[in-house]
Amino acid sequence: MGKQPLAKKAEIVDKVRSLLQASQMVLVIDYKGLTVAEMDQLRAELRKSDSVCMVVKNTLMRRAIADQKAWAGIIPFLAGPTAFILIRGDISAALKAYQDFAKQTKKTEFRGAGIEGLSLTLEQAKAIAELPPKEVLMAQVAGSLKSVATGLAVGLNAVPTQVARGIHEIPASLGRAIRAIADKEAA
């Protein structure tokens, strides 16, 4: 394979950068042994989850992520024949599509993943994929905060009620005590 002109390499790096900026996670896989038809099949499956599979030279990927701390986690995996799955949409759907493809072909190997500057193993990537979407997590937090606020309001409302009951009880108790003393003296 001949050397690519510098302008072509810069164009590839720019394209990869723009795809990375739109991505939530990057999976790094070894594609050695996959046919063109199999790569096309993987790409088609990944498109369903708004993900892209691309083969980029490791040196060009290093250039693309050089100034992006969010993708520093994939640097240890940049060796040998490497394909990158850039996940822009549903992480769990993309991961499942890749795993199903890997089981079917038995020709690809998961090297690792990167997210927010971290390197992830397959198990860690699966754990992240199983998290509910951001909107659901935010709703759960909001619901928890609402229940805490409601409990606090009910508790604070109960304090004056208890004080009022106590104040009301003092004269009644005093009246019962005076009546008991009077009954004792009368007897």
Curated annotation (Swiss-Prot):
InterPro entries listed in its UniProt record: Ribosomal_uL10, Ribosomal_uL10-like_sf, Ribosomal_uL10_bac, Ribosomal_uL10_bac_type, Ribosomal_uL10_CS_bac
One function term, GO molecular function aspect: structural constituent of ribosome
Any one annotated GO CC term: large ribosomal subunit
One BP term from GO: translation
Family: Belongs to the universal ribosomal protein uL10 family.
Its job: Forms part of the ribosomal stalk, playing a central role in the interaction of the ribosome with GTP-bound translation factors.
SUPFAM superfamilies, sorted: Ribosomal protein L10-like
Keyword Cell division: no
Alphabetic keyword roster: Ribonucleoprotein, Ribosomal protein, RNA-binding, rRNA-binding
Quaternary assembly: Part of the ribosomal stalk of the 50S ribosomal subunit. The N-terminus interacts with L11 and the large rRNA to form the base of the stalk. The C-terminus forms an elongated spine to which L12 dimers bind in a sequential fashion forming a multimeric L10(L12)X complex.
HAMAP family: Ribosomal_uL10
Keyword check for Nuclease: no
Protein name as it appears in the record: Large ribosomal subunit protein uL10
Gene name, Swiss-Prot/TrEMBL: rplJ
